[in-house]
Structure formats: C-alpha cells, structure tokens
Amino acid sequence: MLSLSHYLVLGAILFAISVVGIFLNRKNLIVLLMAIELMLLAVNLNFIAFSHYLGDLAGQIFVFFILTVAAAESAIGLAILVVLFRNLRTIHVDDLDSLKG
C-alpha cells in the first residue's frame, strides 16, 4: 500500500525534474513548454494525493480545472510557436528578442 508520503515524494521529484529542465534548457521553446506541463502535472499529483488522503473531492475537482487550463495553455503556446516558426524560421529563445511593429 502506498502512503501519502510516496505520492508527495514522486510529485516533488517530478517538480524538481521540470525545474531542472527549465534551468538547463533555455534555448528551445518546445522543451520549455513540456517542462511547464510536467510541473503542472506534479502539482496535480499532489492535489490528488491530498484529496484522497483527506477524503475530500475538492482537490480532485480542482485538478480538472488545472488540466483544462493546461490544455488551453498548450494549445495557445503551440499556436504561437507555429506562427513564430513561420515568420522567423526558428524557435530558439535567443532569436526572439526583436519586435515587429
């Protein structure tokens, strides 16, 4: 039987992996978006673990809202990436410092 601490440790490990992914890879926007999504999933795992441990459904309902926002964020982020790649032929963060007006 897995206890609450097992889920919290797994959530902390996933969160730490995503933070390391953000700090180590600041060049590629797709990898940055994937690291942010992994961070949100780690937070969702903690919400579900606490919700199950406390016997309350509020945490699980909150996870559905977070997943909805994460899906919208991914769709908008990928749409922005497609537009940037069409215009600039790159998705590296260093090359996105110029603004058109």
Curated annotation (Swiss-Prot):
Hydrolase in keyword set: no
Record's bilayer topology term: Multi-pass membrane protein
Top enzyme class: translocase
Localization: Cell inner membrane
Annotated keywords: Cell inner membrane, Cell membrane, Membrane, NAD, Quinone, Translocase, Transmembrane, Transmembrane helix, Transport, Ubiquinone
Catalysed transformations (reactions): a quinone + NADH + 5 H(+)(in) = a quinol + NAD(+) + 4 H(+)(out)
Biological role stated in the UniProt entry: NDH-1 shuttles electrons from NADH, via FMN and iron-sulfur (Fe-S) centers, to quinones in the respiratory chain. The immediate electron acceptor for the enzyme in this species is believed to be ubiquinone. Couples the redox reaction to proton translocation (for every two electrons transferred, four hydrogen ions are translocated across the cytoplasmic membrane), and thus conserves the redox energy in a proton gradient.
Subunit structure: NDH-1 is composed of 14 different subunits. Subunits NuoA, H, J, K, L, M, N constitute the membrane sector of the complex.
Family to which the UniProt record says this protein belongs: Belongs to the complex I subunit 4L family.
HAMAP family the UniProt entry points to: NDH1_NuoK
Record protein name field: NADH-quinone oxidoreductase subunit K
Biological source species: Aromatoleum aromaticum (strain DSM 19018 / LMG 30748 / EbN1)
Name of the encoding gene: nuoK
